[in-house]
Amino acid sequence: SAAALYGAVAANGAIMVTTKSSQSGKVAINVSSNTTVETPMVLPKFQNSYGVSNQGTFSWGDKLASASPNYAKDYYNLGYTTNNSISLAGGNDNISSYFSYANVSSNGIVPENTYMSHNLLAKVGFNLWTKLHVDVSARYNNQHIENQPTAGYVGNPTLGAYLFPRGEDWDYYKSNYEVYDGTRNINVHNWTNTAQEQFSNPYWMLNRQKPVSYRNRYE
C-alpha cells in the first residue's frame, strides 16, 4: 500500500509522477486534473450499554438509559485529494525540451489535516557532436503539511475520539475544547477528566498542538 511505502503522510494514497524525457518535434501540451474522495473504510464498534466510569475517564460505568451515538464517526470528515498537472514538450533534431508543473491539494479525513505540494521539472537534451548527447534536468518540490496523521498512544488525537466515555456530551467538548485556568493564567484543554491526563481532547490537540512541516527540495 502507499502508506507502507511512504508512511503516515500517504495514509490516503500517494500520487506517483513518472517524468518523461525531453522530445524533439512539434510542441505537445498535456493537461490533467482529477479529484478523489475519501471516507473511513472501517470504524470500530462500541458498546452502548454502560456509560462513563466514576472517575470520568473511561466507559463501563453505570448502565445507560439510551444508546450513545458513534463519536468516532462524527470525528472524521469527508476527505478529498485533487491533482493537477501541465506539461510542455518539443524541440528539433539538435535540441529538445520538457517542462512540467504539478500540484496536489488534500484535506484529510482527520480534522485540520491538510497537504499541499508543488512540483516543477525541466529537462533539456541536446547534441554536441554526432556521437555525444547531453541531458540536463532540474527539479523542485515544495510541501506543506498540517496535522499529519500519527499512530500510537502519545500525540494521537484519534485516541481521544475512540476512547471518549460513552454517554458523555461529545458536542460540548468539541465546541469547548479549552477552558481558562486562573491559577496559571492560560487556556488548558477541557476533557471529561482532565486531572487524570489519560488522553487529551482531540480538538485541543488539532487546534492548539498542530504540527506543521515544510519541505523544499532541489535536485
Q: Where is each model-derived feature located?
A:
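Beta-strand elements of well-folded, non-transmembrane domains
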Residues: S105, V124-F126, N142
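Short secondary-structure subsegments characteristic of cysteine-rich extracellular domains
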Residues: N113-G125
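Membrane-embedded beta-strand positions in outer-membrane beta-barrel channels/transporters
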Residues: A14-M16, N83-S85, N119-A122, R139, ...
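Hydrophobic or amphipathic alpha-helical targeting/insertion segments
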Residues: L132-V134, R139-N142
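Short acidic/polar hinge/loop motifs at secondary-structure boundaries
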Residues: S1, G7-V9, G13
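Residues embedded in well-ordered regular secondary structure
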Residues: G13-A14, S21-E112, K131, Q148-G152, ...
